[in-house]
Swiss-Prot record:
Residues 1-26 form the signal peptide. GO terms for biological process: defense response to Gram-positive bacterium. The keyword Transmembrane does not apply. It is found in: Secreted. Disulfide bonds join C97-C152, C115-C167, C122-C129. Pfam families: RnaseA (PF00074). Does not exhibit any ribonuclease activity. SMART domains: RNAse_Pc (SM00092). This is Inactive ribonuclease-like protein 9. Its main location: secreted. Belongs to the pancreatic ribonuclease family. It comes from the Eukaryota. Keywords: Disulfide bond, Glycoprotein, Secreted, Signal.
């Protein structure tokens, strides 16, 4: 009879098996996260990005906010800041470590406003970046060991400077959103200020 059931109703049997296994899978995932509903969405997105073989999906507000924005807690000058935060926030590119990353101590809305500031040159051959008008505290992470997760090791650098970002248009919300944090430029240590043209003016 079992053989007849398998041969005549294979799809039904597969669906029943899937339903039986589903609670076990969710129970295992829930033990890793404190707030299941919010974290499950993040976990699904992470798995999708991890397994993706095509182009990386464009960033969303939620993804940028989760990966870049930080709140007061661990001292920003702590030497293991990047190692802990990158693991906690799942900052990876598919199965590889990111070579560099920035964490910013600011509100997402303030970061988004930078997209409408004037253009300035930025590093790594990128021609146009938007620069913050004020100084922002953050941490720069530079990969020092390994290239595949979970063995990524980073050196952490505390910075207080002007944020340079690139932005992209998001059709769903009809506005510019931050795309990439290009740099966090520390001002010269002598007395100076930025004029309206984005040039450092040194005071006598």
């Amino acid at each position: 009879m079992m053989r007849t059931l398998i041969t005549t109703h294979p799809l039904l049997l597969l669906l029943l098996l899937q339903q039986l296994l589903q609670p076990v899978q969710f129970q295992e995932v829930d033990t890793d996260f404190d707030s299941p509903e919010d974290k499950m969405e993040e976990f699904r997105e992470y798995l999708e990005e991890f397994r993706r073989t095509g182009p990386t999906r464009p960033p969303t507000k939620e993804k940028v906010e989760r990966r870049v924005i930080i709140e007061p807690g661990m001292p920003l000058y702590h030497r293991d800041y990047c190692n802990e935060e990158i693991m906690r926030k799942n900052v990876y590119h598919k199965q590889r470590c990111v070579t560099e990353h920035y964490f910013l101590l600011m509100q997402y809305d303030e970061l988004e406003k930078i997209c409408y500031n004037r253009f300035v040159p930025c590093k790594n051959g990128v021609r146009k970046c938007n620069r913050s008008k004020g100084l922002v505290e953050g941490v720069y992470c530079n990969l020092t060991e390994a290239f595949k997760i979970p063995r990524c090791k980073y050196k952490s650098f505390y910075r207080r400077g002007y944020v340079l970002i690139t932005c992209a248009w998001q059709n769903e919300i009809h506005k510019l959103i931050p795309h990439t944090i290009n740099d966090l430029v520390e001002p010269p240590k002598h007395r100076s200020f930025l004029n309206e043209d984005g040039v450092f003016v040194i005071l006598p």
